[in-house]
């Protein structure tokens, strides 16, 4: 997205231009703490808003069903080569439109309807696509679930092994949407081998940390790895499938196209290539390390202020606040922090007595605001702001002061200062 493109948009469709302007301002004025969100670079947005959006390209590089794909092939092959280098994969498919699409392509390859899959309970930090009854994964397959220990709130690998021995799943899924500790992929491999299961890692949340060595890499231990390309990887919204097994990789390719998708979104694939190129640079490794340092600073300060952190801390980019410690629900906290321009999301905590629509938790993450340049000092201040508002929900004067502190942080670390959207006045 460039100023030129925005100028054209403001002239041809001022209504949409106006909406974009409002959203840009919202992003600039808020502390974005949703763990699954990030701010892409201007280069990623430029690729995604490019002429590649005009081209159909069913198939793979050098194996297309349409003519005129020679430059599309170059862009997609560059994305493939870069991501294989980034993660150490032997095979990669960069075409899935989303992480959910990537997961379903894997299921289509490895499973038949009625087969048993084993993933983490959604309420413990799993994901909808890992067997939730409201998702196709929970409708087409027999699902068994594992969770965390009631005492430590961490993965209990002995219990996971016991469940696997009893249920004999065909596929075991590890990788989560709300788990703040490192995953031992080697232990999962041993469990899968004992029961004869495939092992899949969904690293959508931690991909950027894996790419830079700040989290163990699942590829040496898993049959297949899926991920989104946004979140900690800081690319466009999309999905990705990787494996060390090239023959299995060819089967995944067929499950993406023609199995679950038609034409790929090659403008998004090009944006993925840009993001993978950025992630290969030394600066991105520094960024990933700062993401973790900032998350730990935030969790530490909230804990110091008396707010319970699930698992008592974090090893990655996110944390879960158990708000029973302050007599509040996740829904209430979500609404409360939004009044001071902090964006977060309510989330279940392990063994949560509340419904998923209310919850006892609030999920926070550091990737987006780390991208804006905030460091540990600023995240400690964010921790104090959040603690102040959660511990004093009825103090209007304090709420006003907290909103001003948020505004000061946002002004000190501007977002996309080069972007300007001028919207003509409507008659």
Swiss-Prot record:
<keyword id="KW-0663">Pyridoxal phosphate</keyword>
<keyword id="KW-0963">Cytoplasm</keyword>
<feature type="site" description="Plays an important role in substrate specificity">
    <location>
        <position position="230"/>
    </location>
</feature>
<keyword id="KW-0808">Transferase</keyword>
<dbReference type="InterPro" id="IPR039429">
    <property type="entry name" value="SHMT-like_dom"/>
</dbReference>
<dbReference type="InterPro" id="IPR015421">
    <property type="entry name" value="PyrdxlP-dep_Trfase_major"/>
</dbReference>
<keyword id="KW-0554">One-carbon metabolism</keyword>
<dbReference type="InterPro" id="IPR019798">
    <property type="entry name" value="Ser_HO-MeTrfase_PLP_BS"/>
</dbReference>
<dbReference type="InterPro" id="IPR015422">
    <property type="entry name" value="PyrdxlP-dep_Trfase_small"/>
</dbReference>
<comment type="similarity">
    <text>Belongs to the SHMT family.</text>
</comment>
<feature type="binding site">
    <location>
        <position position="247"/>
    </location>
    <ligand>
        <name>(6S)-5,6,7,8-tetrahydrofolate</name>
    </ligand>
</feature>
<feature type="binding site">
    <location>
        <position position="122"/>
    </location>
    <ligand>
        <name>(6S)-5,6,7,8-tetrahydrofolate</name>
    </ligand>
</feature>
<dbReference type="GO" id="GO:0035999">
    <property type="term" value="P:tetrahydrofolate interconversion"/>
</dbReference>
<dbReference type="InterPro" id="IPR049943">
    <property type="entry name" value="Ser_HO-MeTrfase-like"/>
</dbReference>
<dbReference type="Pfam" id="PF00464">
    <property type="entry name" value="SHMT"/>
</dbReference>
<dbReference type="GO" id="GO:0019264">
    <property type="term" value="P:glycine biosynthetic process from serine"/>
</dbReference>
<protein>
    <recommendedName>
        <fullName>Serine hydroxymethyltransferase</fullName>
        <ecNumber>2.1.2.1</ecNumber>
    </recommendedName>
</protein>
<dbReference type="InterPro" id="IPR015424">
    <property type="entry name" value="PyrdxlP-dep_Trfase"/>
</dbReference>
<feature type="modified residue" description="N6-(pyridoxal phosphate)lysine">
    <location>
        <position position="231"/>
    </location>
</feature>
<dbReference type="GO" id="GO:0005829">
    <property type="term" value="C:cytosol"/>
</dbReference>
<feature type="binding site">
    <location>
        <begin position="126"/>
        <end position="128"/>
    </location>
    <ligand>
        <name>(6S)-5,6,7,8-tetrahydrofolate</name>
    </ligand>
</feature>
<dbReference type="InterPro" id="IPR001085">
    <property type="entry name" value="Ser_HO-MeTrfase"/>
</dbReference>
<comment type="pathway">
    <text>One-carbon metabolism; tetrahydrofolate interconversion.</text>
</comment>
<comment type="subunit">
    <text>Homodimer.</text>
</comment>
<feature type="binding site">
    <location>
        <begin position="355"/>
        <end position="357"/>
    </location>
    <ligand>
        <name>(6S)-5,6,7,8-tetrahydrofolate</name>
    </ligand>
</feature>
<comment type="function">
    <text>Catalyzes the reversible interconversion of serine and glycine with tetrahydrofolate (THF) serving as the one-carbon carrier. This reaction serves as the major source of one-carbon groups required for the biosynthesis of purines, thymidylate, methionine, and other important biomolecules. Also exhibits THF-independent aldolase activity toward beta-hydroxyamino acids, producing glycine and aldehydes, via a retro-aldol mechanism.</text>
</comment>
<dbReference type="GO" id="GO:0004372">
    <property type="term" value="F:glycine hydroxymethyltransferase activity"/>
</dbReference>
<comment type="pathway">
    <text>Amino-acid biosynthesis; glycine biosynthesis; glycine from L-serine: step 1/1.</text>
</comment>
<dbReference type="GO" id="GO:0030170">
    <property type="term" value="F:pyridoxal phosphate binding"/>
</dbReference>
<keyword id="KW-0028">Amino-acid biosynthesis</keyword>
């Amino acid at each position: 997205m460039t100023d030129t493109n925005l100028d054209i948009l403001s002239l041809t469709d001022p209504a949409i231009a106006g909406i974009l302007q409002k959203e840009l301002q919202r992003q600039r004025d808020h502390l974005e703490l949703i763990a699954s969100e990030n701010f892409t670079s201007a280069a990623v947005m430029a690729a995604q808003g490019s002429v590649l959006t005009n081209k159909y390209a069913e198939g793979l590089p050098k194996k297309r069903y349409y003519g005129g794909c020679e430059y599309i092939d170059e862009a997609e092959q560059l994305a493939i080569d870069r991501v294989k280098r980034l993660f150490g994969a032997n095979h990669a498919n960069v075409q899935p439109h989303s992480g959910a699409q990537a997961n379903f392509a894997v299921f289509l390859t490895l499973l038949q309807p009625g087969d048993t899959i084993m993933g983490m309970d959604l309420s413990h930090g799993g994901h909808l696509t890992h067997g939730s009854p409201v998702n196709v994964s929970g409708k087409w397959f027999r699902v068994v679930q594992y969770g965390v220990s009631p005492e430590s709130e961490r993965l209990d690998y002995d219990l996971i092994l016991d469940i696997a021995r009893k249920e004999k799943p065909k596929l075991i899924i590890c990788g989560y949407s709300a788990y703040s500790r490192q995953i031992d992929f080697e232990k999962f491999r041993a469990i899968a081998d004992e029961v004869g299961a495939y092992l899949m890692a969904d690293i959508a949340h931690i991909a950027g940390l894996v790419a830079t060595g700040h989290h163990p890499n699942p590829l040496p231990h898993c049959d297949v790895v899926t991920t989104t390309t946004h979140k900690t990887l800081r690319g466009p919204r999309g999905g990705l499938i990787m494996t060390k097994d090239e023959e299995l990789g060819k089967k995944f390719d067929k499950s993406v196209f023609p199995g679950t998708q038609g034409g790929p979104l090659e403008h998004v694939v090009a944006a993925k290539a840009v993001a993978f190129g950025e992630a290969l640079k030394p600066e991105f490794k520094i960024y990933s390390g700062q993401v973790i340092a900032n998350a730990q600073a935030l969790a530490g300060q909230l804990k110091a202020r008396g707010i319970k952190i699930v698992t008592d801390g974090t090893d990655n980019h996110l944390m879960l606040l158990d708000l029973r410690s302050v007599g509040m629900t996740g829904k209430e906290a979500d609404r409360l922090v939004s009044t001071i321009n902090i964006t977060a999301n309510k989330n279940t905590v392990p063994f949560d007595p509340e419904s998923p629509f209310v919850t006892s938790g609030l999920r926070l993450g550091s990737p987006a605001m780390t991208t804006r340049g905030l460091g540990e000092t600023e995240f400690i201040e964010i921790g104090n702001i959040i603690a102040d508002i959660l511990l004093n929900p009825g103090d209007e004067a304090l709420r006003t002061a907290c909103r001003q502190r948020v505004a000061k942080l946002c002004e000190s670390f501007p977002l996309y200062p080069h972007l300007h959207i001028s919207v003509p006045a409507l008659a």
